[in-house]
């Protein structure tokens, strides 16, 4: 007869009619009973031959991705001119007085951020844009290129000009200028004042691209500037438009312009196939002999192009420079030939664009280190796209980077901190990750880009193969013409116009601000926002500012007070160069929505959309059918988030955790499903802990337990000896049920930690319910008043300790000790006794 649900509830002491707790509870620690119940509920059955279920409602296995949907009308989001001020520490000090050591350390971490992986794997440019949408290859290519171009224009990416130089838009930081031979970028006064220099012969010859750039430049990670002779410099104004290598090189740097000095670079024919001859850019743009460009100092800069004749290779016939413009002079091969499209415009614009500033970078190969693709911005906003960058190579394999850990407030700390009668609002930081600047030395490791449209299309169409010897010759120019490509490009022409030409060229971009796809970024963002909030909290001691990643919340006593705080904080953040999105500021009233929780003066509960998800999950959950452990991972993730709000908490999910660990399928019995279902249908808020004096103490030995409740002492014995942790847990439960006290003193670290998942399953579930909302204070064994009763000695009465309990707010220091501050700020309090901070994260 399988265990009925009612009987199971009674067994777990969840119903009122249970006998005395001192008799009932120790039974739940019995191994034999736990085994029988597990068998009854199919909790640990050996593997079964029934096929596993791989999908439950929306939950599929962890690694089976849902099929993404491409939207041809995606809008590329606009990025404001984000420039975090370099003197951020000075500005904060003007605002709040001297910063604490902690705040300074955190702000220095992101000014600039540095990234040096152990080794970097370089991928061919063809892998730059992932063929994520096979039906919309060309459309996705151009949308992605447009997104990358937008990021470059917004100063978020560097563009690789040559293997040792890059250009960017926006405002430069001093560490970018320092790379220019230790000097600032040339000011307008120095235009043309310097003679032309030959490059010094001391420059080491180029070594082949190794798996790791770092080793060679260990001494100076920024590319050995100290040993370099001055680079060839023409009369070109402030931002160097060209970097030329004066000694003839057999490998031409990717994407470099023809050299101004007049030397003809000798290309090897091999490089034609591997670096795609469109690297000779403006040579093809022959109908415009010079292109004017505003330099950053406001002077027009002229770039003289070499006539195409000088760029011919000696070893083969004419090499065509620009794949796109070649179609202009060729005969149409069909009705869908690209030459029809190219002839629509006389002026297709330049082959490449250059940034306002040029800097030196460590040697960067013409490769990428991660692929990119587009997805919906979020489930609620499918009109805009979001760029996904896959730098997962740094988290995999033997050379993987172990990312720094950082403190995330646990649920109880968060509740202690934010559960109050304040009015709340949350600020939206636009493109938060793109605020934090990266040092240029990280550029060779974080490269994205594309190989240009011609190679991209050729790669994907199996019938046209790129042969080394015929690349760029007429016979395979029209190989890429097809009806599908022609129709796609005609439609895209309406959107992008003459930019189609620019986007069809290869490009390599490195990150100038931290990208989302690297494990370092969340850490840096968390450090940055927590330091800023710490500064705000000290400037307005009567208010509360708190952040988790890019989610910043402000709380104040009244709505009027909150509005004035909002104005002051917004102005402060804008003065630092942090961009806020005022349209997305949310005013929450007295219950704050934050990190998936609703937090009010009554405590914390999960947000409504999460409870709806849980209900839906239980509706779809099959009974008596083995479910794939990967699907169980998804289910447990959802249920685990809401577990602290249920009667039995995490211990109720232990059977699921066990099967995931064993990588076995899990079968829900009707009783276990009904039990979980009932658990999650009634959620109880997690309340904030209150400070107080501990009056109740519990202690146990393997054979007996003892309590000290005020001046009263109690003791009892167990039927059979129990493991010490189990005995201590039982004693704590008895203390709670006898006294009703929410504050109990114990000398057992496991009970203090409130992790009841390692106890016998039934006992863990019952204890979680009995001890819900209880706070523990650590009392050393020698001073524990319950120590004597637990050893059977009632006569001796040790005096009760005065043990105060102060709830902790995790690592969020609300009472940061300020360095000497202006006198108008009130004195701050500092609680730092290890004995008082007794709370351990659940």
Curated annotation (Swiss-Prot):
Keywords: DNA replication, DNA-binding, DNA-directed DNA polymerase, Endonuclease, Host-virus interaction, Hydrolase, Inhibition of host innate immune response by virus, Inhibition of host RLR pathway by virus, Magnesium, Metal-binding, Multifunctional enzyme, Nuclease, Nucleotidyltransferase, RNA-directed DNA polymerase, Transferase, Viral immunoevasion. Mg(2+) binds at residues 428, 550-551. Residues 178-345 are annotated as: Spacer. Residues 1-177 are annotated as: Terminal protein domain (TP). Residues 184-238 are annotated as: Disordered. PROSITE patterns: RT_POL (PS50878). Activated by host HSP70 and HSP40 in vitro to be able to bind the epsilon loop of the pgRNA. Because deletion of the RNase H region renders the protein partly chaperone-independent, the chaperones may be needed indirectly to relieve occlusion of the RNA-binding site by this domain. Inhibited by several reverse-transcriptase inhibitors: Lamivudine, Adefovir and Entecavir. The record marks 63 as: Priming of reverse-transcription by covalently linking the first nucleotide of the (-)DNA. GO terms for molecular function: DNA binding; DNA-directed DNA polymerase activity; metal ion binding; RNA-directed DNA polymerase activity; RNA-DNA hybrid ribonuclease activity. Residues 212-228 have a biased composition (Polar residues). Residues 356-599 form the Reverse transcriptase domain. SUPFAM superfamilies: DNA/RNA polymerases. Its EC number is 2.7.7.7, 2.7.7.49, 3.1.26.4. InterPro entries: DNA/RNA_pol_sf (IPR043502), DNApol_viral_C (IPR001462), DNApol_viral_N (IPR000201), HBV_DPOL (IPR037531), Rev_trsase/Diguanyl_cyclase (IPR043128), RT_dom (IPR000477), Viral_Replic_Matur_Polypro (IPR051320). The keyword Ubl conjugation does not apply. Residues 346-689 are annotated as: Polymerase/reverse transcriptase domain (RT). Hepadnaviral virions contain probably just one P protein molecule per particle. Multifunctional enzyme that converts the viral RNA genome into dsDNA in viral cytoplasmic capsids. This enzyme displays a DNA polymerase activity that can copy either DNA or RNA templates, and a ribonuclease H (RNase H) activity that cleaves the RNA strand of RNA-DNA heteroduplexes in a partially processive 3'- to 5'-endonucleasic mode. Neo-synthesized pregenomic RNA (pgRNA) are encapsidated together with the P protein, and reverse-transcribed inside the nucleocapsid. Belongs to the hepadnaviridae P protein family. PANTHER family: POL PROTEIN, RIBONUCLEASE H. This is Protein P.
